[in-house]
Curated annotation (Swiss-Prot):
The lineage of its organism: Bacteria, Pseudomonadati, Chlorobiota, Chlorobiia, Chlorobiales. The keyword Protein biosynthesis does not apply. It comes from the Bacteria. SUPFAM superfamilies: Ribosomal proteins L15p and L18e. Signal peptide: none annotated. Residues 21-35 have a biased composition (Gly residues). Residues 1-62 are annotated as: Disordered. This is Large ribosomal subunit protein uL15. It comes from Chlorobaculum parvum (strain DSM 263 / NCIMB 8327). PANTHER family: 50S RIBOSOMAL PROTEIN L15, LARGE RIBOSOMAL SUBUNIT PROTEIN UL15M. GO terms for molecular function: rRNA binding; structural constituent of ribosome. Gene3D superfamilies: 3.100.10.10. One of its GO terms (biological process) is translation. InterPro entries: Ribosomal_uL15, Ribosomal_uL15/eL18, Ribosomal_uL15/eL18_sf, Ribosomal_uL15_bac-type.
């Protein structure tokens, strides 16, 4: 007995089912898929079938909630701003546009300045939010804080105002509509 004489047991290996090869094969014409319908078309597979086993999407619990009006806030520490100033990446005034480019943020982001780190530069920083410690450190160094009210995307959509001005003007309050009372 040698390796070349080894064969699988009789009946252990089944031949491949060749479908769609004429009526004599028993699986011609419709190739065992029945007549018409989505299941007979090519490319059809049932999504997430696990063959009678409880599928994953039903085994796992539902959880969480995504608020529709969630604000995306990018946080920047004063130590980071100080580093940018020392490297010469920003000047005397740091705008929301500067923060966007230096943080690789999107146009929908709000920016919050946090007070971590040392800060000795007298600069004007424009951002949407400031922590109390950040305001104290900036003013102690001789700088100013300017609050922006809109994201870059919102400011670009304001008609009749220059971009920089649109950033800094507060949004108009949303007025609630009064319900009309039915007179009958």
């Amino acid at each position: 007995m040698d390796l070349s004489s080894l064969r699988p047991a009789k009946g252990a290996v089944k031949g491949r089912k060749r479908v769609g090869r004429g009526p004599g094969s028993g699986n011609g014409t419709t190739a065992g898929k029945g007549n018409k319908g989505q299941q007979s078309r090519s490319g059809y597979t049932r999504p997430v079938t696990e063959g009678g086993q409880m599928p994953m999407y039903r085994r796992l619990p539902k959880f969480g909630f995504t608020p529709p009006n969630k604000k995306s806030v990018a946080c920047v520490n004063l130590a980071q701003i100080q580093m940018w100033i020392e490297k010469g990446l920003v000047g005397e005034e740091i705008s929301v546009l500067d923060l966007k480019h230096l943080c690789n943020a999107s146009n929908q982001d709000y920016f919050k300045i946090l007070g971590n780190g040392e800060f000795e530069s007298a600069v004007t920083i424009t951002a949407h939010f400031f922590s109390k410690s950040a305001v104290e450190k900036i003013e102690k160094a001789g700088g100013k804080t300017v609050t922006a009210y809109r994201t870059l995307e919102e400011a670009s959509k304001v008609n009749g105002l220059p971009f920089e001005e649109a950033l800094l003007t507060p949004k108009a309050p949303v007025l609630k509509k009064k319900k009309k009372s039915d007179k009958s």
